[in-house]
Amino acid sequence: MLNVVKITEKDYNLLLDWNNGKDENYLFQWAGPKVYHYPITIDQIESHADEEFSQIYIILDNENPIGSIELEKINNETLSAHITRFILCDNAKNKGFGTLALKQLIKIAFKELGLDKLTLYVYCFNIRAIRCYEKAGFLVKEFHQREDTRWNYYTMEFEKK
């Protein structure tokens, strides 16, 4: 059974493990340019975990940690948040866990946090992630052109029905 639960300090090393042996582009792809810098460290994770309007979650498959996903920019006035820094360990990819995790996070956001809208960014080249997000009900809303076209990205959105 898949569950999405709030991260605890004992989980911080998991993020390091899932990035072990990966390069700077890998970190940039899943974490973006602002929060974590290569190489990712416990200090960076601790600092980020304490940020207001943000929540890091661990994805569990039968109590085994297989990934992490975050809600940030949680806004109780606009009833919205942004999904970001979504990572699955290598042996959990291509098994449907990403879609299941997103559906769990959507339930948390809408039922527990009282939100109505979620957004996320995804790089245009990341077809596997785009398909995962679409399976969970997200729609492409906007294209963003960057100077380095490799990092062009979409905004995707999920609204409460």
Spans of features found by a protein language model:
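Extreme N-terminal starter segment of soluble prokaryotic enzymes
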Residues: M1-N3
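C-terminal "cap" of GNAT-fold acetyltransferases
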Residues: A81, D116-I130, K135-K161
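Conserved glycine-rich acetyl-CoA-binding loop
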Residues: C89-K103, Y123-R131, K135
